[in-house]
């Protein structure tokens, strides 16, 4: 019998530079699915690949699929196992079921409760369905997951309140500028927070973003995801005047943006307002910058209370979401328990049909040879009943008294 197994590479453990090494690009995903599906013992598979996670879901006949899936991932991307081994998470059975539901509901996301992941999961499911790498078990698993996610969204407020500093930054910028899509944004840094800011700004329709970082390659990684421009940190001062929004989050030990730089930028901009958010500790922007007219400067302390309030709200909802997941998974596990019964029924049905066809052929030949119709039909009925009942009768005779009531339940015409 197949069992559910998951190999996960996600944001909780894995830096961007490793995640991108194991990502499946759209042009290679279908071939990757087919290759995985052709591995002996893999009955079905789905691959999810986003900027924050790569996950492989399989219905496998192997007792443990961790080594197999880890080797597949390394071989597919032509990388050594020791590069990724410490970043891999493996789940099977009920743990796999819980993990997938946590992913679908946003409980496992970088931003607690974010809804985008459900759409990404549905897309991965549909791709697997199109290339025929699904079976009944994975079909049922993902339909259960989507239903559970919908129930969580309907019955909790897990996605209602923004929780990340990045999200709050974007919401604050909307108060300054009515149309974010028309603004130019300068993002300074290339860490997790800047990546999230880029994500939310992109969702708001911002298509003019500049990512500046000391290591240009790290800036390019984020810029590539959102079709932004990437520059080195030494260059950013010449781009400041172009920015309507500046969000900075570096690891610099001293401020990198001073009052003089912003004064010059404002003159070039003819005092068009600049929204600035400093989410670095120590601060990246000199506090004196906030004294300038047409500058709206916020620090992480200004956002702290908003974020903490929303984290509290979502943490409460997280508990409710987990309760729903547990209850829904109990229903799914009951269905899993019936699979051996279904297989037994299918096997018995196949055997019964074989017996029926064999006896029917004999009866037809007898009728063609002139045998009496009524006698032939009666003989067919008797033989069919005897052959079909032989094995059940044998098993009933060998069944203990304690289990006899279960046998009676399978024979509705028994009279008490």
From Swiss-Prot:
PANTHER family: GLUTAMYL-TRNA REDUCTASE. Homodimer. It comes from Ruthia magnifica subsp. Calyptogena magnifica. The active site is at residue 51. GO terms for biological process: protoporphyrinogen IX biosynthetic process from glutamate. SUPFAM superfamilies: Glutamyl tRNA-reductase catalytic, N-terminal domain (SSF69742), Glutamyl tRNA-reductase dimerization domain (SSF69075), NAD(P)-binding Rossmann-fold domains (SSF51735). Disulfide bonds: none annotated. Gene3D superfamilies: Glutamyl-tRNA reductase, N-terminal domain (3.30.460.30), NAD(P)-binding Rossmann-like Domain (3.40.50.720). This is Glutamyl-tRNA reductase. Possesses an unusual extended V-shaped dimeric structure with each monomer consisting of three distinct domains arranged along a curved 'spinal' alpha-helix. The N-terminal catalytic domain specifically recognizes the glutamate moiety of the substrate. The second domain is the NADPH-binding domain, and the third C-terminal domain is responsible for dimerization. It catalyses: (S)-4-amino-5-oxopentanoate + tRNA(Glu) + NADP(+) = L-glutamyl-tRNA(Glu) + NADPH + H(+). It comes from the Bacteria. InterPro entries: 4pyrrol_synth_GluRdtase, 4pyrrol_synth_GluRdtase_dimer, 4pyrrol_synth_GluRdtase_N, GluRdtase_CS, GluRdtase_dimer_dom_sf, GluRdtase_N_sf, NAD(P)-bd_dom_sf, Shikm_DH/Glu-tRNA_Rdtase. During catalysis, the active site Cys acts as a nucleophile attacking the alpha-carbonyl group of tRNA-bound glutamate with the formation of a thioester intermediate between enzyme and glutamate, and the concomitant release of tRNA(Glu). The thioester intermediate is finally reduced by direct hydride transfer from NADPH, to form the product GSA. The record marks 99 as: Important for activity. CDD domains: NAD_bind_Glutamyl_tRNA_reduct (cd05213). Its EC number is 1.2.1.70. Catalyzes the NADPH-dependent reduction of glutamyl-tRNA(Glu) to glutamate 1-semialdehyde (GSA). It is an enzyme of class 1 (oxidoreductase). Belongs to the glutamyl-tRNA reductase family. Keywords: NADP, Oxidoreductase, Porphyrin biosynthesis. NADP(+) binds at residues 189-194. Substrate binds at residues 50-53, 109, 114-116, 120. Pathway: Porphyrin-containing compound metabolism; protoporphyrin-IX biosynthesis; 5-aminolevulinate from L-glutamyl-tRNA(Glu): step 1/2. GO terms for molecular function: glutamyl-tRNA reductase activity; NADP binding.
């Amino acid at each position: 019998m197949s069992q559910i197994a998951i190999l996960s590479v996600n944001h909780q453990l894995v830096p961007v530079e490793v995640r991108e090494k194991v990502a499946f690009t759209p042009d290679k995903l279908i071939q990757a699915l087919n290759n995985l599906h052709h591995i002996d013992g893999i009955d079905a598979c789905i691959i999810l690949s986003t900027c924050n996670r790569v996950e492989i879901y399989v219905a496998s006949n192997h007792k443990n699929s961790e080594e197999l899936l880890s080797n597949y991932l390394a071989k597919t991307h032509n990388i050594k196992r020791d590069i990724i081994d410490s970043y891999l998470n493996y789940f099977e059975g009920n743990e796999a079921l819980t993990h997938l539901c946590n992913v679908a509901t946003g409980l496992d996301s970088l931003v607690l409760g974010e809804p985008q992941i459900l759409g990404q999961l549905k897309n991965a499911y549909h791709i697997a369905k199109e290339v025929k790498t699904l079976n009944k078990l994975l079909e049922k698993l993902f339909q259960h997951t989507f239903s559970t996610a919908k129930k969580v969204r309907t019955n909790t407020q897990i996605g209602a309140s923004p929780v990340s500093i990045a999200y709050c930054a974007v919401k604050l910028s909307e108060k300054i500028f009515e149309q974010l899509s028309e603004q130019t944004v300068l993002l300074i840094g290339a860490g997790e927070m800047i990546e999230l800011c880029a994500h939310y700004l992109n969702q708001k329709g911002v298509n003019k973003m500049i990512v500046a970082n000391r290591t240009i390659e790290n800036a390019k990684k984020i810029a590539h995801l959102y079709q932004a421009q990437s520059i080195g940190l030494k260059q950013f001062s010449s781009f400041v005047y172009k920015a309507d929004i500046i969000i900075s989050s570096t690891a610099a030990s001293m401020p990198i943006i001073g009052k003089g730089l912003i004064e010059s930028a404002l003159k070039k901009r003819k005092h068009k307002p600049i929204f600035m958010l400093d989410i670095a500790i120590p601060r990246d922007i000199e506090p004196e910058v906030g004294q300038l007219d047409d500058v709206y400067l916020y620090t992480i302390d200004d956002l702290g209370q908003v974020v903490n309030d929303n984290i509290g709200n979502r943490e409460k909802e997280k508990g409710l979401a987990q309760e729903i997941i547990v209850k829904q998974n109990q229903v799914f596990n009951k269905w899993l328990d019936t699979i051996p019964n279904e297989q037994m029924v299918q096997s018995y049905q196949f055997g019964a049909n074989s017996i029926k066809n064999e006896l029917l052929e004999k009866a037809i030949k007898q009728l063609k040879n002139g045998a009496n119709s009524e006698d032939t039909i009666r003989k067919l009925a008797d033989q069919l009943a005897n052959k079909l009942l032989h094995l059940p009768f044998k098993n009933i005779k060998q069944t203990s008294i304690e289990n006899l009531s279960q046998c009676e339940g399978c024979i509705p015409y028994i009279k008490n």
